[in-house]
Every structure is written in structure tokens, then in C-alpha cells.
């Protein structure tokens, strides 16, 4: 392999942290009011020290289902991946880490959320696909607007 050849490979995908809470069970199982479901996403990346070319990207998915003041369940999943990233131009790195890596990780996190919610006694929650490109562009626009004010 040429030393200057761009390299982007998945080395490993893993769950870094999981949390599931159902603070009002078993009462939440008999509630008739449909809960509102809020989903939050966050992405973080760090270069792994001592492992040349490896970057860890973590996608955190937070889901809360509530009806009024009653919490049906709360889930947080940190789905991580180790990616070998070498000889990628610096200007392409932000999009690679904020768009492409989370796009790879999201289906795994989605599966974990559905499984946890189902094992918690609720109907499995299947999260809708996420357009990380649009989220990235939106964040870039907000950043530009913030810096020009």
C-alpha cells in the first residue's frame, strides 16, 4: 500500500456505555396516555493516543419517553467505533468524523435502543434514519452565523 494512499477503515464497532431506566414501572405499562418521545444525538471524536492512525468516534443517542410528568423510560446509548484514518486531507476530516462515521454507527445504536426498550417491557422503539449530512450543514451554518454576529 502506498504511504500516501488515503485510508479509511472500520477497525471495530462497540457499545461503550448503556443506560436504561423505567422509573415508573410497572405503572407506566398501564398508562393510557401516549408518551412523547424526545431523541437527542451527539457525536464526539478523539485520536487514540499510542495507536497511530486510529480515531475513536462515539455517537450518543438519548431517548426519553414521557407523558406529562411521568417518565415511561429513558435510554442512553454510546455507540463507538475505532476508525483507521490516514492520509486524509485535513479539510475533509470534520465531515468524515461528523457525517460518515456517525452514519456507520447509527444503525448499531438504533438496534441497541430498540432492544433495550423492548426488554424494558415496552414496544420496541425503531428510530427513524438520520441525515447526518444535513445536521452537519445546519451546525456549520449556525457556527458561521454565530461568528459573524
UniProtKB/Swiss-Prot annotation:
Coiled coil spans: none
Gene3D superfamilies found in the cross-reference section: SecB-like (3.10.420.10)
Superkingdom of origin organism: Bacteria
GO BP field: protein tetramerization; protein transport
Localization per Swiss-Prot or TrEMBL: Cytoplasm
Assembly information from the UniProt record: Homotetramer, a dimer of dimers. One homotetramer interacts with 1 SecA dimer.
PANTHER family for this protein: PROTEIN-EXPORT PROTEIN SECB, PTHR36918
General function of this protein: One of the proteins required for the normal export of preproteins out of the cell cytoplasm. It is a molecular chaperone that binds to a subset of precursor proteins, maintaining them in a translocation-competent state. It also specifically binds to its receptor SecA.
Protein name: Protein-export protein SecB
